[in-house]
Amino acid sequence: MKKIPDAVRLFQVTDSHCYASDDSRLTWTDMPIYPNLSLKAMLAHLRTRVVGYSALMLTGDLAQEETPATYQRVNTMLNAFPLPVYTIPGNHDIPKMMQENLSGNVQMPEHVAVGKWHLLLLDTHADGKPDGRLTDEQFERFEKLLVSIREDHFVAVFMHHHPVPIGSEWMDVMGLRQRTYFWNLVEHFPQVKVVFNGHIHQEFNGQHEYAGGRTVAVHGTPATCVQMKPVRQNIEFDHTRPAWRDIALLPDGSVQTQVHYLPFVVREEAIKSSI
């Protein structure tokens, strides 16, 4: 993706599904996935590309094994990364445990302003539920933030769950539950230009279109562990190459973005170093 002067450049990484031990293998697929090693490989690769970037956006499902030790291990890996890391919970996470064990370079803000762009991070986690939900209080805070943003500024929203259907029946029942309410609210704020989500373990590039012709782009990002095949009635695993999304938020309010995959499959022997 071509570098553009004055663009706000971000990495998005999502769905690492980590464990307390780097030796742990992902249990819900037969594919040989060691989530901690995949995340380590991703961070090592991105570390060589950080010039000109503002932050790493980590959009949920940090943990598969939801324990303090897992979040402490993830925190250690992320604090070795030379950019601020902004993160939100996914359905596999425990938000309170994240807050208690993530620190230093790793933050859980609701609002980050970078130039004319505002990054709004929504926590769509709901205890014991695979789908995404926002409470009335969260919607109220979201609306207040939008009201506070100047009309000549721009908004990029980050959430774990997808706010539009992606065409896979088994996954679409686990998207954002209140998507209609969400889009009705966003309709009043033309500053909102784009939504980025995780959760779906596949690349998705779509949009929500309003009756008047306005569109808001929606981009889903593949995981750092295992990928799933798109447009399926039932879950089908695809491959194990970790992915990230490169994001450029331009000064005129437009967005450029592209998904990349590591050029190799992460195997247990691929990374021997202990970060």
Label each PLM-derived region with a short phrase:
Residues 1-73:
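N-terminal active-site segment of His-dependent metallophosphoesterases
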Residues 2, 67-154, 178-191, 209-222, ...:
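Extended active-site neighborhood of metal-dependent phosphoesterases/phosphodiesterases
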Residues 7-23, 116-125, 156-158, 216-222, ...:
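Active-site-proximal beta-strand elements of phosphoester/diester hydrolases
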Residues 12-14, 55-61, 85-91, 123, ...:
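Active-site neighborhood of phospho(di)ester-bond hydrolases with catalytic His/Asp-centered motifs
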Residues 17-22, 64-69, 92-97, 127-130, ...:
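Active-site environment of divalent metal-dependent phosphoester hydrolases
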Residues 25-33, 128, 169-174, 233-235:
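Short glycine-enriched, charge-decorated loop/helix-capping segments at active-site entrances
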Residues 36, 207-275:
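Binuclear metal-dependent phosphoesterase catalytic core
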Residues 42-55, 132-217, 255-256, 273:
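His/acidic metal-ligating clusters that form di-metal
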